[in-house]
């Protein structure tokens, strides 16, 4: 009886996840494929800012459970403006003076300085409040900033769609690790990797997640447009990158699970079939900087990091 109820709950949850994530991914791919157009770039900036604000707010809410932190909304607003400026400077970098990409960092610096004076009369004081707010903002916003630079890092070249290819590749390989790990871990996983931090993470799920990332990497290479084939890494590099993204996505999930366990919550929020924005972004928060660094190293002649 218990097994039957457990299976029905699992199947119901699985169907909800499949439907919601399929709709979200379809919309995201369409948006990214058209992200070079001004109207779509505006939507990308708007959604990226919203994701940064919501993710930062959720992180601040977890911090507030442990500490008397009073600047959750302030941090979320700072992240939103930081990412909006990033999207503007990344997409239109060629239209602005050199080093315009420093503008978001100048904003963040003065936003933090303002917080120092705002937090003088609060319990945590300037050091505690500023440190926690800065962590909440940077933990979520920096990976999103790097993602936008990947997306728009080739707009100055004859093949600006290379950035779109890398952005979709990053999401597909990382999320395939999540999907394969979830399915195979639920179906066949027995030995848990970190039972205290994340009870659902199993050895089978971890291996399946890495295999899923590698498989998607190979699929992407097999459908590589010839127009910019010389600007994409060779197959063995993509296979290695798929493995690295599978591992990094796993640990990104583990890191967020560590925060949630410390705050004694199950999900970062209560969004239906998603959990929370951090639950969606967790694996990408660690894999995005890796892809960005690899592009800086391998595509340094064409990639505007």
From Swiss-Prot:
Give GO cellular component annotations, separated by semicolons: plasma membrane
**Principal place of residence:** membrane
Q: Note whether Lipid metabolism occurs among the keywords.
A: yes
Q: In which pathway does it act?
A: Phospholipid metabolism; CDP-diacylglycerol biosynthesis; CDP-diacylglycerol from sn-glycerol 3-phosphate: step 3/3
What are the record keywords, sorted?
Cell membrane, Lipid biosynthesis, Lipid metabolism, Membrane, Nucleotidyltransferase, Phospholipid biosynthesis, Phospholipid metabolism, Transferase, Transmembrane, Transmembrane helix
Transmembrane spans: 27-47, 67-87, 96-116, 124-144, 150-170, 202-222, 232-252, 277-297
- Give the record's membrane topology: Multi-pass membrane protein
- Catalytic activity, reaction form: a 1,2-diacyl-sn-glycero-3-phosphate + CTP + H(+) = a CDP-1,2-diacyl-sn-glycerol + diphosphate
Enzyme Commission identifier(s):
2.7.7.41
Superkingdom field: Bacteria
Note whether Translocase occurs among the keywords: no
Residues in a coiled coil are none
GO molecular function terms noted in the UniProt entry: phosphatidate cytidylyltransferase activity
A UniProt-annotated Pfam family: CTP_transf_1
* One of the protein's GO biological processes: CDP-diacylglycerol biosynthetic process
Spell out the family assignment given in the record's similarity comment: Belongs to the CDS family.
The name this protein carries in UniProt is Phosphatidate cytidylyltransferase
Q: Which organism is it from?
A: Chlamydia trachomatis serovar D (strain ATCC VR-885 / DSM 19411 / UW-3/Cx)
Gene field = cdsA
